[in-house]
Amino acid sequence: MATPSSLWLGLALLGTLGVLQTPAQASLQPNFQEDKFLGRWFTSGLASNSSWFLEKKKVLSMCKSLVAPAPDGGFNLTSTFLRKDQCVTRTLMLRPAGPPGCYSYTSPHGGSNLEVSVVETDYKNYALLHTESGPSPGPAFRMATLYSRSQAPGAAVREKFTAFAKARGFTEDGIVFLPRNEKCLEEHE
């Protein structure tokens, strides 16, 4: 049996080599610029391991989100989406949780703590985000999200999201591009 000091040394070495990565340590957009991330985004694509998502993905539709600065250095993420033929608006408080581009929030469904990382963005067209739940007794909740500045992301962006989601272990049937719904997505250019 390994001594406690050799066990810690082994874990430290694995962490240094990048073998043990947490969502916050997973790749982040280099030199993330929070001010360029602000503004309107559309949730254009999703992938998740959630049983709820897999059951409901055929009835989900695109939502509009507004990212605004919060006093604590994080973001207020206000999303408007269609639910039961009504537009519903909800706001999440994204709190800084590490280097720029890494945030945490409390799920409105169950109160669990989640970490979201902006993995890649060009700020003008798309952003790829990865969300994961903290330690829990069951399987970790994971989600990949494609944000786009327009309601119709191009083929290259869609392909980039598909590759991004698959690289995080999501299968083809766990990836969905959300259809537009005219009711809640006014453009306001």
From Swiss-Prot:
Modified sites of kind Pyrrolidone carboxylic acid: Q25
Q: Which residues are glycosylated?
A: N49, N76
Disulfide bridges in this chain: C87-C184
Q: In which tissues is it expressed?
A: Abundant in the brain and CNS, where it is expressed in tissues of the blood-brain barrier and secreted into the cerebro-spinal fluid.
Q: What is its main location?
A: endoplasmic reticulum
Keywords from the named record: Cytoplasm, Disulfide bond, Endoplasmic reticulum, Fatty acid biosynthesis, Fatty acid metabolism, Glycoprotein, Golgi apparatus, Isomerase, Lipid biosynthesis, Lipid metabolism, Mast cell degranulation, Membrane, Nucleus, Prostaglandin biosynthesis, Prostaglandin metabolism, Pyrrolidone carboxylic acid, Secreted, Signal, Transport
Location relative to the cell? Rough endoplasmic reticulum; Nucleus membrane; Golgi apparatus; Cytoplasm, Perinuclear region
Identify which top EC class this enzyme belongs to.
isomerase
The record places the active site at C63
* Signal peptide per UniProt: 1-24
- Name any Gene Ontology BP term: mast cell degranulation
Bilayer-crossing residues are: none
Molecular function GO terms recorded: prostaglandin-D synthase activity; retinoid binding; small molecule binding
Quickly give the catalysed reaction: prostaglandin H2 = prostaglandin D2
Q: Which cellular component, as a GO term, is one annotated location?
A: extracellular region
**InterPro entries membership:** Calycin, Lipocalin, Lipocln_cytosolic_FA-bd_dom
Q: Does the keyword S-adenosyl-L-methionine apply?
A: no
- Source organism superkingdom: Eukaryota
Annotated EC: 5.3.99.2
Task: State whether it acts alone or in a complex, and with which partners, per the record.
Answer: Monomer.
Similarity comment text for this entry: Belongs to the calycin superfamily. Lipocalin family.
- Function per UniProt: Catalyzes the conversion of PGH2 to PGD2, a prostaglandin involved in smooth muscle contraction/relaxation and a potent inhibitor of platelet aggregation. Involved in a variety of CNS functions, such as sedation, NREM sleep and PGE2-induced allodynia, and may have an anti-apoptotic role in oligodendrocytes. Binds small non-substrate lipophilic molecules, including biliverdin, bilirubin, retinal, retinoic acid and thyroid hormone, and may act as a scavenger for harmful hydrophobic molecules and as a secretory retinoid and thyroid hormone transporter.
What domain comment accompanies this record? Forms a beta-barrel structure that accommodates hydrophobic ligands in its interior.
For this entry, the protein name equals Prostaglandin-H2 D-isomerase
Source organism per entry reads: Sus scrofa (Pig)
